[in-house]
UniProtKB/Swiss-Prot annotation:
It catalyses: [ThiI sulfur-carrier protein]-S-sulfanyl-L-cysteine + a uridine in tRNA + 2 reduced [2Fe-2S]-[ferredoxin] + ATP + H(+) = [ThiI sulfur-carrier protein]-L-cysteine + a 4-thiouridine in tRNA + 2 oxidized [2Fe-2S]-[ferredoxin] + AMP + diphosphate; [ThiS sulfur-carrier protein]-C-terminal Gly-Gly-AMP + S-sulfanyl-L-cysteinyl-[cysteine desulfurase] + AH2 = [ThiS sulfur-carrier protein]-C-terminal-Gly-aminoethanethioate + L-cysteinyl-[cysteine desulfurase] + A + AMP + 2 H(+). It comes from Geobacillus thermodenitrificans (strain NG80-2). The keyword Glycoprotein does not apply. Catalyzes the ATP-dependent transfer of a sulfur to tRNA to produce 4-thiouridine in position 8 of tRNAs, which functions as a near-UV photosensor. Also catalyzes the transfer of sulfur to the sulfur carrier protein ThiS, forming ThiS-thiocarboxylate. This is a step in the synthesis of thiazole, in the thiamine biosynthesis pathway. The sulfur is donated as persulfide by IscS. It is found in: Cytoplasm. It is an enzyme of class 2 (transferase). Pathway: Cofactor biosynthesis; thiamine diphosphate biosynthesis. Gene3D superfamilies: 3.30.2130.30, HUPs. This is Probable tRNA sulfurtransferase. It comes from the Bacteria. ATP binds at residues 183-184, 208-209, 265, 287, 296.
Amino acid sequence: MKYDRILIRYGEMTTKGKNRNIFVRRLKNNIARKLQAFPRIKIEYMRDRMYILLNGEPHEPIIDKLKTVFGIHSFSLAMKCENDLAAIKETALAAVRQLPYKGKTFKVSARRVDKQFPYRSDELNHEVGAHILRQTEDLTVNVRQPDIDVRIEVRQDGTYVTCHDIFGAGGLPVGTSGKAMLMLSGGIDSPVAGYLAMKRGLEIEAVHFFSPPFTSERAKQKVIDLVRKLTAYGGKIKLHIVPFTEVQQAIYQGVPNEYSLISTRRAMLKITDALRRRQRGLAIVTGESLGQVASQTLESMYVINEVTNTPVLRPLISMDKMEIIEIAKQIDTHDISILPYEDCCTIFTPRAPKTKPKKEKVLQHESQLDLAPLLEKAINETETIVIDEEAGQADEFTALF
């Protein structure tokens, strides 16, 4: 007897009340997309949990993929048997025997959801625990801190046995909170912001500002590689690559050096907001962390934000750099982010940027420029590619067929 299914627990989704089924269906669809390489599996779901029937598929690679699906609190390999005491005993014993149990401790934790079952939970604990002890060697009982917790759940459709919980990615299923545009540079912070945004259920489309010849094709490829890492958590992601050279040069030539960074960020936000409207997004996500650099002081963010009424979400706002780096390493974006290819945010960085810019002065400087046609041109010439975890990338036209 082998594990024949994986039991999935929802966690935060259980608080969603009448809307829970919307979240559960989205999670099922996200899991099905993630596991499409395993055609024999079958996914069954109910209000409080989900089951993946393996039907002969190997569980190890499936477990690895489930760890990156948002909306899963935890999951366990499981066996199912009839609501019969003898069958439950043998199933629990088989589950323990598939583990390296010798020299370990265990306990049995039974839960009788089906109140028609003739044995109480404590009686099941005793009966099954005694059977396991009789049929194994070098395994002892520890009810307080066991190495192995044999969980038995008697439900109306059958009894489920698990022995080991694996923590999932948590959060909410991607797509349940709407769509947002992620302003993605080649640095450490913005990919982490994208990851955390998806963890809260957002579908993201990435926007990258590309300034050739000052930034190279290698810098562009670096961003594509970062997006591909994020697809492990969110599925296919659109990447919008904005030609930004003319806008950036106009600002650099027409705005005093200490204010150029603020005006550049304002232009980026205007373009991103226009792309958001075109793509029917509801918010913009950035990798800003309060006080980390000159453009991320509260005064700077206030002046930059003035160009839009769209919600600007900043998942990293209270994190320090070391916390951000730790997450970047966990999601495998760190080593790509530190590759030495400059992005548009670094090539025209002023020596002494204003950390407390005045909105009136920014507006005065920008009034001397005719940026609107350049912004419109950048929006119209934006290149869109679709990046997938498995398939790599395709341009938007190809991706439609």
